[in-house]
């Protein structure tokens, strides 16, 4: 996925109210931008961090600039949580998810379960329906190990419960973790920051929910899914 138009460099001053950040450019001009991420962004909000912004000419937007990339630990990290669903389609088209190939129809944002929407519903006359839930990942504490979540997510735990019900009905269900940074070789669930999600994840795997993780190459030109990474179900004291 290419950034069109190109991104603009800036420095982060602070992030606040989840959806906002104050930033400054080289000319020291300070202004407010939108932040397309509802999570904690743990480890990505250091003052004076190098960041990159997209510009949107839509006059209905309150803030014309939007945060897209943060530099952390000498690595570019994508923070826009609306992008992984676009990157999933690229990953499937590029052969990174052969387990999900062969489906003729891919439906987005379909209602299922009791009160949820699935990111993707894959359908084909010759294959069982596959319900695919996608999560954005950017958190790293140990070198090379990406983790999710970086804070408690009751909604995420509910999604795992819904996927287990799908499997019980004889259909396929899968979790796909899109890692918007390149400096990782493995992925794990962050049990210590969200024990409930960790327990639900363990149950989901035992119930037959499939799980995949893909890391992306991040640059100011674009974000591209490039490689599967192994999944290690570690605990925080492992």
From Swiss-Prot:
InterPro entries: SfsA, SfsA_C, SfsA_N. Disulfide bonds: none annotated. It comes from Bartonella tribocorum (strain CIP 105476 / IBS 506). GO terms for molecular function: DNA binding. The gene is sfsA. Coiled coil: none annotated. This is Sugar fermentation stimulation protein homolog. Belongs to the SfsA family. NCBIfam families: sfsA (TIGR00230).
